[in-house]
UniProtKB/Swiss-Prot annotation:
Protein's UniProt name: Protein CASP
InterPro entries: CASP_C
Keywords per UniProt: Coiled coil, Golgi apparatus, Membrane, Transmembrane, Transmembrane helix, Transport
CC per GO annotation: Golgi membrane
Organism the protein comes from: Schizosaccharomyces pombe (strain 972 / ATCC 24843)
Entry similarity comment: Belongs to the CASP family.
Pfam families assigned: CASP_C, CUX1_N
Length: 633
């Protein structure tokens, strides 16, 4: 196909090269000028001929014989000019035909040119996209290489940190064991001394108790020895004070033992934490506070977005429920209107309808006929119907616009949810980096001047890659504060966007409610207008105009709607005129066309029936052809 198209293009180009198109245009211009001149001369000649023929007809027969030759010459010259015009036109036509008659149609060539231009544009766009993709691929490859290098360095630093941590843990274990053994020895010596003192004090207490008993016995026997008793009582008081002092010393020793035990426990559990410096503790506290702030902000953003989504969903559900309820009410009212019928009321309304009359707007038109009033009423109803149709169209357009706005707002909400998820992922990555920083601070404290710590490599990168030096503690704090500021700005932006979205959704919901109420009013007015139009048409056909006026027409119209009764009457009259077969068909059609589901099922049944008939006819035709084939042979 490509070879054939190239051959056609070559033929077209060669034929249009050999066609002398510019020369043909020039010749055509010259021929057009000559034709215009000939047309002018021919018009002048015709005018002369017409004038002379009129004069010739007016002259008598004797003069006509003398002027006949002049007229014949004029006619001959006119015929010669016409022949010249025809010959010149034929010559120009044949020249154009000879040059362009065999030339093929240039339309495919133009299409090919347009397609070529389109393909060239597409190729240029694809080239640009290719260059952009190549640039992005190169950037991604560079990033992957950098990530691989960083991972390798991280693995190296992890291995070094683990080895140094193991060494330091072994050293601290040995030191703790030594200190613990020394303290145990001290505690044992102290316990032995305390036990000996306690034994001495208990023995003294027993001796004092025995001496006090003896003293009591002697006091009961010898009342005269008062001075000795006083001396002994003083001694007893001194011994008791010594006992109190000994008890206090015992309590103090027990408290010191408990404190020493707690210190040993703290030394066992916190031997590895003694090496942490105050700066590292400050950094740990800063990272903990930063993580807590970020987590609280994230939770607040999540709760706000969740509440907003819940409000949106609730509003949408309420609107859907209201629409469903309105549809149900409408269907119920339609069913009731179709089913409701009462013979007595219809009979009474028929008797009144024969004499009913539309009340005029002015009191001066009381003597006018009913037909003129009906015509006026018809004009008013037609104008109202046109206005209501225009308002209905405007309301439907507004509803479509509001639905589009609601869908656009839902899309915005989904986009914000995706952005929040990305933020959560970024915060999780920040938490992971903080944990890595906390676990590797021991290595950073004793690192050499020529090596990077793991935290500095994570926060700032490799100096060979980014042409920078080892980051200090201030750089870590600055990066953390920058991350917090960025996240706060994003949070404020999302809150503002959420507030605007909530306001827009509430405004859209209010507009939708107003439009739905207006639509319901328009539908009601449309039904009333339709009933009035039907009643007017029937009244003009079946009732002759009369001058009788009924005074109770206005009161009756206020109490009873004659249009609904007329519609029922008309339906019953048409149904009574039907035959049995027509009634069956009418009932079937009414059941089939009652709802969308029945209509769809009936339509599908018709399609399947037609397809079945087509298949049967095709099979019969094929069978007939196969039956007639041996007869032909």
């Amino acid at each position: 196909m490509a070879v054939a198209s190239e051959a056609l293009l070559q033929k077209l180009t060669e034929s249009w090269k050999n066609s002398r198109f510019e020369e043909l245009q020039r010749e055509a211009d010259e021929a057009a000028a000559e034709i215009e001149k000939m047309q002018k001369t021919s018009l002048d000649e015709r005018k002369e001929l017409s004038s002379k023929t009129k004069e010739f007809r007016k002259q008598p027969d004797e003069v006509k014989l003398g002027e006949m030759k002049g007229l014949l010459k004029l006619y001959q010259s006119g015929i010669d000019s016409l022949t010249k015009r025809a010959k010149s036109a034929e010559a120009t036509f044949f020249r154009v035909y000879e040059t362009l008659g065999e030339v093929p149609d240039p339309y495919p060539l133009l299409i090919e040119a347009a397609n070529n231009l389109k393909t060239q544009k597409q190729i240029e766009d694809l080239k640009k996209e290719k260059e952009e993709m190549e640039g992005s691929l190169q950037g991604k490859e560079k990033l992957e290489r950098e990530v691989e290098n960083l991972r390798k360095e991280l693995d190296k630093y992890k291995d070094l940190v683990e080895t140094e941590a193991e060494k330091r843990a072994a050293i601290t274990k040995e030191e703790c064991e030594k200190s613990w053994l020394e303290q145990q020895k001290l505690y044992k010596d102290m316990e032995q001394e305390n036990a000996s003192t306690i034994q001495k004090l208990t023995s003294k207490i027993r001796e004092l108790q025995a001496s006090q008993l003896d003293h009591d016995l002697q006091a009961s026997q010898n009342e005269s020895a008062g001075l000795d008793v006083n001396a002994k009582s003083a001694e007893v008081n001194a011994i008791l004070s010594e006992l109190d002092d000994a008890n206090k010393i015992i309590v103090e020793l027990q408290a010191e033992i408990a404190v020493l035990k707690q210190n040993t426990k703290e030394q066992k559990s916190g031997s590895s934490q003694d090496d942490l410096s105050n700066q590292q503790k400050q950094q740990l506290d800063f990272m903990d506070s930063l993580n807590k702030k970020l987590s609280t902000e994230l939770e607040s953003i999540k709760e706000a977005s969740r509440k907003e989504m819940e409000t949106h969903c609730a509003t949408i559900q309420t609107l859907e429920n209201e629409v469903k309820e309105a549809r149900k009410v409408k269907e119920e009212s339609l069913t009731l209107a179709n089913k409701f019928s009462d013979y007595d009321e219809i009979k009474r309304e028929l008797s009144v309808l024969k004499q009913i009359e539309f009340s005029g707007e002015h009191a001066t038109h009381e003597n006018t006929s009913l037909e003129s009033q009906l015509l006026k009423r018809e004009k008013q109803l037609s104008e109202e119907l046109a206005k209501l149709r225009s308002t209905n169209a405007q309301l439907t357009d507004r509803i479509t616009q509001e639905s589009k706005k609601a869908s656009f707002l839902e899309q915005k909400a989904s986009e914000q949810e995706e952005v929040i998820r990305k933020l959560e992922k970024d915060l999780a990555d920040v938490d992971v980096e903080g944990s890595v920083y906390l676990s590797n601070t021991t290595y950073r404290r004793e690192g050499t001047s020529g090596q990077l710590s793991p935290t500095s490599s994570i926060m700032g990168g490799n100096p060979s890659l980014f042409n920078g030096s080892v980051l200090s503690r201030n750089s870590v704090n600055e990066t953390g504060s920058a991350i917090v500021d960025v996240i706060k700005q994003q949070r404020d932006r999302f809150r503002r966007a959420n507030v605007t979205l909530v306001n827009q959704v509430s405004a859209a919901n209010d507009k939708i409610a107003l439009l739905e109420s207006k639509l319901e009013e328009v539908e009601k007015s449309n039904t009333l207008l339709y009933e009035q139009m039907r009643f007017r048409d029937h009244y003009q056909k079946h009732v002759e105009p009369s001058s009788s006026h009924l005074q109770t027409a206005a009161a009756y119209e206020n109490s009873i709607s004659p249009f609904a009764s007329f519609r029922k009457k008309e339906a019953e009259r048409a149904y009574s005129r039907m035959g049995s077969f027509e009634r069956i068909v009418y009932a079937l059609l009414r059941t089939l066309l009652f709802s969308r589901a029945t209509r769809g099922l009936f339509f599908m049944y018709l399609i399947l029936l037609h397809l079945f008939i087509m298949i049967v006819l095709l099979k019969l035709g094929i069978a007939g052809n196969t039956a007639y084939t041996p007869m032909n042979y």
